């Protein structure tokens, strides 16, 4: 299994008025192989989302290194790409899933999934066709023309997953993806992500405070005191 992504010694502190900087990440190390599903658990405020933002190039670490397919992405205190190049990298190589779906309320499920590709290419019909295939794969073939308000919470999150997969990313970063779902839909969501990681050879890094479903992942890490440690999740 080839290594897709590796972060070494990631540090991050935030300045506080009149006080010393508050360290959030203390030399955190993380790797993900191709097609591997990694879950990061930990208490709220432990730095899980901060780390995910660093991995997704949405924020800048204070120190450490990030490698993608063996090539340095962040090293020696700076990203190795311009802001424009980083945005292109994110759009092409990384998919994002958030606790809040951020679906466009005036657009159908199919249009929400197709939107980013349409904006990038200017070709609507091919984007809609690919979106329809993805939604069908995720069990939503009968919901293509439904607005977000007409979908259940679980269906909305599956639309968000389809949107994240639209650019055929190598890596998907998910921040509390089941936070607004009941236990039954949360279980289905994690089962779906586990299946997708194997079928598509897509790596998933999932952040959650809920240990119940972490056992479905290939590897579980616990965020504690700004560092990541192997953990044994609840079964």
Swiss-Prot record:
Domain ABC transporter: 5-234
Top EC class of this enzyme: translocase
Membrane topology designation: Peripheral membrane protein
Signal sequence coordinates: none
EC number: 7.6.2.-
GO annotations of cellular component type: plasma membrane
Keyword field: ATP-binding, Cell inner membrane, Cell membrane, Membrane, Nucleotide-binding, Translocase, Transport
InterPro entries per UniProt: AAA+_ATPase, ABC_transporter-like_ATP-bd, ABC_transporter-like_CS, ABC_transpr_LolD-like, MacB-like_ATP-bd, P-loop_NTPase
Main location: membrane
Gene Ontology molecular function terms on file: ATP binding; ATP hydrolysis activity; transmembrane transporter activity
Family as reported in the entry's similarity comment: Belongs to the ABC transporter superfamily. Lipoprotein translocase (TC 3.A.1.125) family.
Function description: Part of the ABC transporter complex LolCDE involved in the translocation of mature outer membrane-directed lipoproteins, from the inner membrane to the periplasmic chaperone, LolA. Responsible for the formation of the LolA-lipoprotein complex in an ATP-dependent manner.
Protein name as catalogued: Lipoprotein-releasing system ATP-binding protein LolD 1
Organism of origin: Chlorobium luteolum (strain DSM 273 / BCRC 81028 / 2530) (Pelodictyon luteolum)
């Amino acid at each position: 299994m080839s290594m897709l992504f590796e972060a070494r010694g990631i540090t991050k502190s935030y300045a506080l008025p009149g006080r010393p900087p508050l360290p959030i990440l203390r030399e955190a190390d993380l790797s993900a192989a191709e097609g591997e599903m990694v879950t990061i658990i930990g208490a709220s405020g432990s730095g899980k989302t901060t780390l995910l933002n660093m991995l997704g190039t949405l924020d800048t670490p204070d120190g450490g290194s990030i490698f993608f397919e063996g090539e340095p992405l962040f090293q020696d205190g700076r990203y190795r790409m311009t802001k424009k190049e980083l945005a292109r990298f994110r759009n092409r190589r990384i998919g994002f899933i958030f606790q809040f779906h951020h679906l466009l309320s005036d657009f159908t499920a199919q249009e929400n999934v197709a939107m980013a590709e349409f904006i990038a290419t200017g070709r609507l019909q091919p984007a809609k066709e690919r979106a329809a295939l993805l939604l069908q794969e995720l069990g939503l073939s009968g919901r293509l023309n439904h607005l977000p308000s007409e979908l259940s919470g679980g269906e909305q999150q599956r639309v968000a997953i389809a949107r994240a997969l639209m650019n055929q990313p190598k890596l998907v970063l998910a921040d509390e993806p089941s936070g607004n779902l009941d236990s039954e839909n949360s279980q289905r969501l994690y089962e779906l992500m586990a299946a997708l990681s194997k079928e598509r050879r897509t790596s998933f890094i999932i952040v959650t405070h809920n240990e119940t479903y972490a056992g479905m992942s290939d590897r579980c890490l616990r965020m504690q005191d700004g560092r990541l440690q192997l953990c044994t999740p609840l079964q």
